[in-house]
Amino acid sequence: MPDYIDTRHHKMAAGCASVNLDGFMMSEGHIKDLYARYTSNADVAVTEGVMGLFDGYDAMRGSSAEISGLLRIPIVLVVNAKSTAYSVAPLLYGFRNFRKDLNVVGAVFNFVASESHYSFLRQACEDAGVEALGYLPKCADVEIP
């Protein structure tokens, strides 16, 4: 389900228009046209997914994975590392291999406790065949209650 409030937040942050790409409400052609129109003059387009990558209104129908596949958008996984370390390896492996037509380019971790913690996460990425792109440290000052 798209979050219609997010587009306003995106516009404030990016300084340009933001739209929803809704696989339930829009045809594939309309999604492609919207994406082409709103990214035609952009150097970079950040496309935020909703819920989990493969969650849609009917299994994967309307999911972020479906939109990514349709538009050939590379995927950066954002992984909560709060209570895990090397155990993310099979999770990453599964996301990379569940649909071979998708382009999972890497992972960013949040809630990382230390550089040592991140070293386990980097090793998990390496063993799962997913690039570790970085992390956001655990920081009470920026947590949302």
Features from the language model and the residues they span:
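Short hydrophobic alpha-helical runs that function as membrane-insertion/retention elements
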Residues: 75-78, 133-135
